[in-house]
Amino acid sequence: MALNKKLISLLLLIFIILNIVNSHQQEDCDDDDEDIGISAERSERRSVKNSNDGSNFYNLNDYYTPENWNYYSGSFATKDCRDASYITIPLGTTGGLDEGNLSSFLLTKKGSNLFIALDAGTVWQGVRRLTTFKYFNTLFNITYPSWAVLPEQRTSWFLKNHVMSYFIGHSHLDHVGGLILVSPEDYLAKNWIDVQPPINNGIMGLIRKLGFKPTDFTSSSILQKKTIMGLPSTINSISTNLFNNQVWPNLPSFGRYQYFSLASGIEYPFTELVPYNATTMSLVANEFPFSVKVKPFELCHDNLISTSFLFTDSISGEQIAFFSDTGVPSSVACDWEGKIYAVWKQIKIDKLKAIYIETSFPNNTPDSAMFGHLRPRDVMKLMDQLLVQSIQTSPPMTNLKHVKLIIEHIKPQVAEDPNGWTTQRVIYQQLKEANNNGVRIIIPNQGDPICI
């Protein structure tokens, strides 16, 4: 009888322990569902600074599940940000289908909270995800009006006050749809100049730094026009076919936006692409984005003209190359490789920080189904040529280990895959296998910063 009592007591104790363990596991799952940033335990072990100096970005493990992060390269861990100059934030990373995650990136410099957009397929959803990550607002010194407490209120304010300009590579909807949809909220009304307590960062901070006063805006209801930049064919398509009072209200005509048509192969100081005079711009000439020059290049995108934007820092000489859609044509003849090599010839290889380029399909996709897109084998052939075609050092550089290759426009995996892999995983594996030059492959995740 005594033995039976001991056995019953032991079984009861085991039952209680199992229930406690199960309860804690359920709480952990609940916490994971609710917490869209890093875990509370990790956050307690980290100190947070007041600016985005790159020292407080987290390991991929903090955001990605094991199924995802184990085939991503590190992109915003402390070691990657320590020596970085720029930070880019993916607002959308896929090509077509997923309307909440289409091609768009923000770019800024460490220490700045003014951003330029590179394509604009998805804007709202990417910014909403970004602004709700823990510590983003502290790291980038984002200040909101006192009433902006809801995610949608903060998303709207970030768009108004922190996104200055849009560089649009071509006019397909998966590259401009986000800009069109957010345009009703994408402006700062002049009454915000008097908001209390005053907001001294973003575009509001810029206006104050340039010495403007409330009385300077009496003839306009908007503090600053935002700029939409692209090749003439792109600008014409946006203005004629989208902001045309039929597909969408013509908001640029109300002073929301100003178009800038850029000529292929001509370099423009950013100070010439904003609605301020040169004397005013001298006050911020060494700050981002005014310290940057941009040179657009015409690309092939099947039967449409697309664009690469080459950004050069006028102070450090560092360069970043952004490619909108381009690649193997299916319906027309076009020297798509030659046009990309024209970009390579303008790059100083030791100054190159990053390349954004699409990889829409896996290697087994036939040319007849490409329609102006790229596969991993195409991309890595281009990387081989980058070392050959670019402006070299003496002695010449023999690898691309200092360059981040940010892969964009990956089409979702809607067909059967024998391994059950996402297209991101297939493409990452194929890029890695053909990476002869050591370029640092990044498969971006919506809203997660990448130091470059």
UniProtKB/Swiss-Prot annotation:
Biological processes annotated in GO = adenylate cyclase-inhibiting G protein-coupled receptor signaling pathway; aggregation involved in sorocarp development; cAMP catabolic process; extracellular regulation of signal transduction; negative regulation of glucose mediated signaling pathway; response to cAMP; response to catechin; response to differentiation-inducing factor 1
Which InterPro entries does this one have? cAMP-PdiesteraseII_CS (IPR024225), Pdiesterase2 (IPR000396), RibonucZ/Hydroxyglut_hydro (IPR036866)
Q: Which EC number(s) does UniProt give?
A: 3.1.4.35, 3.1.4.53
Q: Where is the signal peptide?
A: 1-23
Q: What induces it?
A: Up-regulated by Pseudomonas aeruginosa, PA14 strain infection but not by Pseudomonas aeruginosa, PA01 strain.
Q: What is its main location?
A: secreted
Q: Which residues form the propeptide?
A: 24-49
One Pfam family, short name: PDEase_II
Q: Which Gene3D superfamilies match?
A: Ribonuclease Z/Hydroxyacylglutathione hydrolase-like
Glycosylation sites recorded in the entry for this protein: N101, N141, N277
User: What SUPFAM superfamilies does the record point to?
Assistant: Metallo-hydrolase/oxidoreductase
Task: Cite a GO CC annotation.
Answer: cell surface
Query: Which GO MF terms are attached to this record?
Result: 3',5'-cyclic-AMP phosphodiesterase activity; 3',5'-cyclic-GMP phosphodiesterase activity; 3',5'-cyclic-nucleotide phosphodiesterase activity; cAMP binding; cGMP binding
Superkingdom of origin: Eukaryota
What activates or inhibits this protein? Answer: Inhibited by dithiotreitol (DTT).
Q: Which UniProt keywords apply?
A: cAMP, cAMP-binding, cGMP, cGMP-binding, Glycoprotein, Hydrolase, Nucleotide-binding, Secreted, Signal, Zinc
Q: What reaction(s) does this enzyme catalyze? A: 3',5'-cyclic AMP + H2O = AMP + H(+); 3',5'-cyclic GMP + H2O = GMP + H(+)
- List localization entries: Secreted, Extracellular space; Cell surface
What this chain does, per the entry, is described as: Phosphodiesterase which displays a preference for cAMP over cGMP. Involved in the degradation of extracellular cAMP. Maintains the responsiveness of cells to the chemoattractant cAMP during the aggregation phase of development.
The family line of this record is: Belongs to the cyclic nucleotide phosphodiesterase class-II family.
Tell me the protein's name: cAMP/cGMP-dependent 3',5'-cAMP/cGMP phosphodiesterase A
Annotated source species: Dictyostelium discoideum
Its taxonomic placement starts with: Eukaryota, Amoebozoa, Evosea, Eumycetozoa, Dictyostelia
Designated gene of the protein = pdsA
